[in-house]
Amino acid sequence: MKDLFRISGVTHFELPLLPNNIPFACHPEFQSISLKIDKWFLGKMRIADETSKKKVLESRIGLYACMMHPHAKREKLVLAGKHLWAVFLLDDLLESSSKHEMPQLNLTISNLANGNSDEDYTNPLLALYREVMEEIRAAMEPPLLDRYVQCVGASLEAVKDQVHRRAEKSIPGVEEYKLARRATGFMEAVGGIMTEFCIGIRLSQAQIQSPIFRELLNSVSDHVILVNDLLSFRKEFYGGDYHHNWISVLLHHSPRGTSFQDVVDRLCEMIQAEELSILALRKKIADEEGSDSELTKFAREFPMVASGSLVWSYVTGRYHGYGNPLLTGEIFSGTWLLHPMATVVLPSKFRMDTMRFSLAPKKRDSFP
């Protein structure tokens, strides 16, 4: 485990400016919609103290939904944002559970997803997911809902395997990690299914089963995970949970003499390669299907999950520390000084041209 000792001694690294050529947008009503989503969460979780409120608001989950589905109808976007909050918390709950708790927890979540549970849950996270799923089942058409339930079930099984491996603190192989993270990320449900739901896309069975549809799902999921593992590394580093991160995996399987910076640079190259893959698939689908195809509509909208995730990963206090003045809505690059409390980057920041809104709420907005 010498690689982990090398990681534990890292104090800083150079963060390049990540590419973001995938079309990016944010819902024009993002301020009021994200506020509504986050206020709903504060109310449901009965969060009253100012410090905890600040953490919720600076996590910017409501804003994340507005970036993932910028062209959604308002009411569907609000529901997608509620679902995003629920899945984030369920993911945290799953990853903090022991391997002995996992089978029952998986069964409970599966039952909540498919509506087979009448139990009253004392765990507020499970109660929250139950309420969200009641809304989703009422709003989502049955074929899409069936696919959603299948996606959640597959992700739960994959998370169970991941928890077992994390308990052993073992580092998987490169391809093994890639496939495992695809499976555990809930991205097909949170990104793919929710894109279809929010935009009103109706894919045929043939389109769903086509290889190029699966390629696009995988490529967007891989891009989201690569960015996540890079920009959340500080949080995982100080949480002691960096065995399952692209940086650890690449370092462990790289030739002798490979530096931490070499691995960061390689990870950034992988992000760029995945971006190019997404753009190529987007064009290929449009060329083959035509502009009116439902699959073309999906290929136009779904990649925004990747670009939205990239931007959100730069502005969330969940990764970079709450109350951090660095999080202004700009993409940053430069020397990243690892610090237990917050992301510190010196000296350069580069404004992102595609982001043309302030993260500050309007004066008329108020929080509970």
Swiss-Prot record:
GO molecular function, one term: S-linalool synthase activity
Names of required cofactors: Mg(2+); Mn(2+)
Enzyme Commission numbers on file: 4.2.3.48, 4.2.3.25
Domain notes: The Asp-Asp-Xaa-Xaa-Asp/Glu (DDXXD/E) motif is important for the catalytic activity, presumably through binding to Mg(2+).
Chain sites annotated for binding Mg(2+) 2: D91
Identification of the protein by name: (3S,6E)-nerolidol synthase
Disulphides: none
Cofactor comment text: Binds 3 Mg(2+) or Mn(2+) ions per subunit.
Top-level taxonomic group: Eukaryota
Motif (DDXXE motif): 91-95
Residues the record lists as binding Mg(2+) 1: D91
Inducing or repressing factors: Up-regulated by alamethicin treatment.
Keywords: Lyase, Magnesium, Metal-binding
Residues where Mg(2+) 3 binds: N228, S232
Catalysis: reaction(s): (2E,6E)-farnesyl diphosphate + H2O = (3S,6E)-nerolidol + diphosphate; (2E)-geranyl diphosphate + H2O = (S)-linalool + diphosphate
One BP annotation, GO: terpenoid biosynthetic process
Pathway recorded for this protein: Secondary metabolite biosynthesis; terpenoid biosynthesis
Chain's role: Sesquiterpene synthase converting farnesyl diphosphate to nerolidol. Also has a monoterpene synthase activity, converting geranyl diphosphate into linalool as the major product. Has no diterpene synthase activity.
Record-linked SUPFAM superfamilies: Terpenoid synthases
Protein family: Belongs to the terpene synthase family.
